[in-house]
Amino acid sequence: MARVKRGVTSHARHKKVLELAKGYRGRSSTNYRIALERVEKALRYAYRDRRNKKRDFRALWIQRINAAVREHGLTYSRFINGLDKAGIEIDRKVLAAIAFDDSAAFGEIVKKAQAALG
């Protein structure tokens, strides 16, 4: 068996980690051991927050819809119930955009939801 020296692979691995740690403060960007910990933690945060981002945006859309619906004298939950009964299938992202950009069109949607509630 030939002797295997690992200098090239470890150098490449270190280089990859230090490249990811570029811009970090202090030794976190220059010392491999510390950089590895920082990079691993950053990747964990990134993974977690890609999922949290979906929750956060949904909550934002609901808040915007709720604020717009209350101007028309209705609550968010009754509005969503009215949309369901009226057979209007618009997702919260689009509803929030309509409420934010085109209040007249949103008012028409609210009227249809109110009519479906009875």
Swiss-Prot record:
Protein name: Large ribosomal subunit protein bL20
Gene that encodes the chain: rplT
Keyword terms of this UniProt record: Ribonucleoprotein, Ribosomal protein, RNA-binding, rRNA-binding
Pfam families documented for this protein: Ribosomal_L20
Function recorded in the entry: Binds directly to 23S ribosomal RNA and is necessary for the in vitro assembly process of the 50S ribosomal subunit. It is not involved in the protein synthesizing functions of that subunit.
Entry similarity comment: Belongs to the bacterial ribosomal protein bL20 family.
Any one cellular-component term (Gene Ontology): ribosome
GO molecular function terms listed in the Swiss-Prot or TrEMBL record: rRNA binding; structural constituent of ribosome
InterPro entries reported for this sequence: Ribosomal_bL20 (IPR005813), RIBOSOMAL_L20_CS (IPR049946), Ribosomal_protein_bL20_C (IPR035566)
GO BP terms, alphabetized: ribosomal large subunit assembly; translation
Keyword Ribonucleoprotein appears in the UniProt entry: yes
Residues in coiled coil: none
KW Ribosomal protein (keyword) present: yes
